[in-house]
Each structure stands twice: as C-alpha cells, then as structure tokens.
Amino acid sequence: MNLSLTQLSVPPTDAEVDAWASVLTAAHAADLPGVPVPTRVEIAGRLRVAPTTGRHVHFAADEGVASLLLFTDAGNAHTASLDVLQVRPDARRRGIGTALWHRVREELLAQGRTSVSTMADLGGAGQAFAESLGFENVLPLAWYVQDVQDVRDVRDVATGTAGAEHGLPAGYELLCWEGLVPQAWVAAAALAHGSMEDAPTGDMDEQTPAWTPQRLHTVQRLVLDRGGRMLMAAAVTPAGEVAAYTSLVLPDPAAPRALQYDTVVVPAHRGRGLGRAVKLRMLGEATARFPALCEIATSVADENTPMRAVNAALGYRRERGAGIFQIKL
C-alpha cells in the first residue's frame, strides 16, 4: 500500500503529540478495556524528554505510530527496544502495522542493530503481530495489580514506626524519599540497585549497565522531567547500607494507577522479610501522599517466584500475561 510515514519533530509539536495520543488511547481502549489509558501528560513526557539509555526515533502514519529506542551505551549498541507499535483498531489489517515495522527495521539495520525486543500482552493483537514477524517470547512475565482501596488499613506504616508486625526485623530502619535519593544515601542505593543483576532476564540481548550514583540520579530525574513523581522506600542499616528498597512511579500524578518499579533485597539481607516491609512502607506513603491513587501495577517474570510470593501476600492479583518478545535481524 502507498502509506505516508513521517518522523516526528524533535521535540514533537502539540499537534503531533495529540495525534499520537489519539492512536494510543484508541488502541488501548480496544485491547485493554479494563486498564486505565495512558494520559496525555505521560505520552507527551515520553515523546518530548529523551531517555537516559539511548535515543528515540518516532514514526507516525495517519492511523498508526511506532517508537524505537536505540540504545547508546557500549554494552547495548547491537540491540534496541521497540517501545511502541500501534494501529488504530478500525484501521487494522490494512498493512499499516507492517509498513511501520518495515520502516523500523530499515532504521535498525542502518544503525547496525542485530536484534530488537518489545513487550506484548499475551493473547492479544500485539503478540499475534509480533509472532507473525518472527519475534519469540524470551522472557514470560505477567502484570499484577494491587487495589490500594482494599489495603488502606496499612497506612500506619507511613509514620516510619513500623516494627516486626510489618516484617521489619531488629537492626533496620525504614526510610522513604520522594524525587531524587538524598546525596547521603545515593551511593548505597546505587550499590543495592546492582543486586538486580540476578533478576530473571531470560534470553534478552539487552544488558543492564552498571549502576552508579550518577546513573541512579539520572534515571530518577527523567521521571520528574517527564512530569511524573517518584517515591523510594528503603530498609537501611546503622552501617549506612541500603539493604532493600522499592520504587514507585506515577507517570501522571493525577492518574489513578501508579507503577511499581524495581524491588530489590541485597543478597546478604534476604530471607528476613525486607521485601514485604519496604513494599508495605511504600503503600502507606503512597496512599497518604496521593489520595486519588486507586491501584498499583507491576510486572514480574514468571520465574521470579520469591517476588511473586511477596506480591501475593500483599494482595496483588494477576491482571494479564505478557512477555518480552525478541527477534534477530
């Protein structure tokens, strides 16, 4: 088909953002009717503020959009992430998605990439399209959701006085920070972040760069620059260690759903209930600071049994299956 594809301005204009949001919200409403749609604040932030791990290239047609993240760190210069490829529901099966993919593939090859990955929900149009192109599911996972209205009785942990009844053993203190981790704790937090190296990654080509204090602050600042808010709850020791932490992001502070980002327990401190403790503290802080918050969503790899058990104990329910799909070029 003769389809006109354009590359968005840098930064995109208001009209370009509106057109992009129109496609995404229409596709989301059709494919995930029970999940809150991404807001314009969230969409504009992702389009206009460059990521920390690479550079975005955004392609648009009248009825479809695609967003490609080309990693720029040395360890990932061979791969990329297809963050978005969506077509308006009433315009599907007309070759628009295929045309967008061909343009994306041209860009990948021109940039010397040998693979690309994307996240897709299982059983939906995204999985079917990805598999038709040759993508394979290299990391099965699922989305889980916690209804905070059902668990507001744990709000007392927001006071910072939570004890053993909330899973915090003696010798630890719970702290919570909004925005950037304080300078006094950023080195310890970055060191703890490195413990995620043993988190399941399946057969993904993408490698996680080393976590440094600078990188941690850069990633956190990106959330803020895109219009969001971020909380981190941590279990710390008298020696100045961050033994465990969890991060919560509100891409749009006015939206009803927040995203649970990383939850990490440093290996030397595992088996003591710290994962549950920091998540309870985070829940208390989030419900106290954001009264309009209705639910928290997180994705967990199927093979990450310990974290799935922690989430189940805190009332998370499985919302939908998903996976990281990857193709070699």
Say what each PLM segment does.
Residues G45-A60, G64, H78-S81, R221-A233:
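A short helix-loop-beta-strand connector motif used in the catalytic cores of GNAT acetyltransferases and
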Residues P89, R93, W101-A184, A322-I327:
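Acyl-donor-binding surface of acyltransferase catalytic domains
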Residues H58-F71, T79-S81, M232-A234, E241-L250, ...:
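Conserved beta-strand in the GNAT
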Residues V87, R93-E106, S132, V265, ...:
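Conserved acetyl-CoA-binding loop-helix of GNAT-fold acetyltransferases
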Residues A80, L108-D121, R257, A286-S299:
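Conserved GNAT acetyl-CoA-binding A-motif
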Residues Q127, A244-T246, L259-Q260, R272, ...:
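Conserved N-terminal glycine/acidic-rich loop preference
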Residues F135-V157, G284-L329:
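Active-site/acyl-donor-binding loops of N-acyltransferases
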Residues M1-R46, T53-G54, H166-Q214:
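Short amphipathic alpha-helix that is part of the acyltransferase structural core
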